[in-house]
Amino acid sequence: MRTTSIMKKPSLKFLISIAAITVISIGVSGVLTAPRYKIAANAPAYDYSKLQKEKLGRGVVAIRENQSEVAVSWRYLSSDPVNTSFNLYRDGKKVAEVPATTGTFYRDTYGSKKAATYTIKPVVNGAETGHIEGSYTLPANAPTGYINIPLDPPTDGTTPAGQKYTYIPNDASIGDVDGNGEYEIILKWDPSKANDNAHDGYTGNVFFDCYRLTGERLWRIDMGRNIRAGAHYTQFMVYDFDGDGRAEIIMKTSDGTIDGQGNIIGDASADYREPGDPTQPTGGDFDKEDPRGKPRQGDPLRNQGRILTGNEYLTVFNGLTGAAMKTIDYIPERGQLEDWGDNRANRSDRFLAAVAYLDGGHPSPVMCRGYYTRAVLAAFDWNGKELKQRWVFDSNTPGNEAYAGQGNHNLRVGDVDGDGCDEIIYGSCAIDNNGKGLYSTGMGHGDAIHLTKFSPTMKGRQVWDCHENKRDGSSFRDAATGKVLFQVKSGTDVGRCMAADIDPTNPGVEMWSWESKGLRNIKGEVINPDIESFSTNMAVWWDGDLLRELLDKNVVSKYDWKAGVCKPLATFTGAASNSGTKATP
């Protein structure tokens, strides 16, 4: 097994701000004053007594902050009484009593380089309750500022065209796969030879690993040669779908996929990759005026490496073992390529996925296909033995035509109409929890979207979206009805937008985009015209106050509302992000 040291790639570094994990921080007192709001009606109406929940433990984490201090964080659980405080032990000796009013966080003075085990015990009315304790062992010679997880990369490979490739860690998700109440990491490995849907060419195989935080690998899934590598092809849902306390993984597979136990799904000999057509021009699938489509020497043959035919499956994998538990034909099925807008699988192989509580009680995987033209969403239920279809929404169904071409590169899930069930915000449209169309704004495809309650005084939830059509720019709408609350039109492709509460002097969440002409409030008013220093990729809770910070690549920045600019708060040298300009952490 190949392993990697702390400073060599690939190793997974968790750069964790312990203060950001707790809502309450001493940094809040005297700095921010929460306005007194009258809460608006029609908020999400989940019945939490019926909602299937994860069976999580304390999630204790200890990270060395400097040579003399260790930061310890843990979870406050929904089952904890509101007056729960905590006793913190190091190697069996109590080192702190943490009051209920100071959050689930403590800095311990500990300068030794030896390993130390931190244990958390909840306390109610002065007595330890024994209710869900937790512990974490800080390793000897622990690095400062992060947790290092050694990884085992897949073996390098060579495509049928003779192109060599290596492997890099890509997207990851978390889930409790063994039922111990703590998360494991499901990591996707992408080959260096991966392709966007617009590009021709062979790719390497995609792999998935499951790791404990110690670096122990539980299993590896090889997706096989019939699953193309690239950002849009494989969306993997990690969740406890059947309520047994252990997470499953649900994703699209094909003939030749090898599960975590070495079992092959379907026909191991099948190879659906196109060899390429030497009689056709090269250059990929781009508009004529796009310089990326200009043929260049060494370009792969037209359609080479694309998968235009062949079996597609939907598989449920056991989270603990990686074993395939159930495989069915994939829905939404490919069908005729032309039904999606082209014959090269650029449009048909745009996949999204989500987990949604469609019945208000149980989580359902929702697998989605297409957004530039035809869009199809299929919801399922997993009961531990059978994967049953709940509903399918298809924009090609008569009456659904307005929903075609409205999807984004991403989606959002939430109860937007107050019925206690989740709806799907699919770009510029919304799908109700029963699989029926809720509304379509007709503003089309975009690259970013945000769903939340932007202000306690506003009814329901809202959506901040940006659009690619060189017309609609950025729009703020009612999430339940699609009614546009304000809009900043633009004659360009608005590729990014962001929404986050970064300014305590302005009520509600702030919004901006590449073409918003400044930082805007919930009324659409410009409260800062200069947003040159603002990133538009990710927002995080980082420093322990009630505001959000911005994350772009390996830099966390914070808005200085007095100066009107964003300033770097932390830069993580040696850390990297995924997916190019999207900079997925």
Q: What annotation goes with each model-predicted range?
A:
Residues 1-12:
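N-terminal secretory signal peptides that target proteins for export/translocation
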Residues 3, 37-39, 91, 375, ...:
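Positively charged, low-complexity intrinsically disordered regions
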Residues 12-28:
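Sec-dependent N-terminal signal peptides
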Residues 28-41:
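Sec-dependent signal peptide cleavage junction
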Residues 43-57, 67-69, 76, 99-585:
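Beta-propeller-forming repeat regions
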Residues 62-66:
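Short, solvent-exposed loop/linker segments at the N-terminal edge
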Residues 77-91:
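Solvent-exposed loop/turn segments flanking beta-strands in beta-repeat/beta-sandwich domains
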